[in-house]
């Protein structure tokens, strides 16, 4: 049988409607970050990011450096966050493309700092805290000291701090509440250490709809942009 291409037709008007619905549910003052990782979950990252920005998204987020560079190559100049880690050897590309990088290891932050100094630029980073997702991040008790070390480096702006919920999409919010507690304690410790971080974010798709108290400074809209519940 001959090979046949497969495609999906995306109603960008419906996508725009979804963004407006999401925006209407965000607490006043919170920024909207549209997550378009994995080619916007198969919907096309470039088209989805354009619609998101047209509908007032403040930030675009992806998972990898290659995804971020693809958007920059397409002409996007908006704030762009990589949610995953990169190797220190990729610092030049991150700084050169004005990408905001997630960090939790000092070797990466130091490489970004050195490259930013070399290029005469300031690189923005977001510190990720492991509160129960089991992925990447510093331990909550180490967050304040890590933030102090980052803030002391030249040409690095610690713009954000965040964490990921593990079970926010299920009815029982017991574990989610524990994650919120750990995140808040870590953020308070960072502030007490004299480091002010302007963008704190932990709310993702499920929390946008069900836990408005944790919208804080920014929310990350993922699968709900496309009309799906996170656990579907």
For the regions a protein language model found, what residue spans apply to each?
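Short beta->alpha connector loops
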Residues: 65-66, 85-88, 106-109, 205-207
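Short, contiguous clusters of charged residues that form electrostatic/catalytic patches at enzyme active sites
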Residues: 13, 17-20, 107-110, 145, ...
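Non-cysteine beta-strand/loop elements that form the S-adenosyl-L-methionine
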Residues: 62-63, 81-87, 104, 123-130, ...
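A charged N-terminal "starter" segment
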Residues: 1-100, 114, 122, 157
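Active-site loop/helix belt of alpha/beta enzymes
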Residues: 3-4, 38-55, 114-118, 131-232
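Divalent metal-coordination and catalytic microenvironments
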Residues: 71, 127, 204
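A generic, well-ordered mixed alpha/beta core segment in the N-terminal half of proteins
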Residues: 97-133
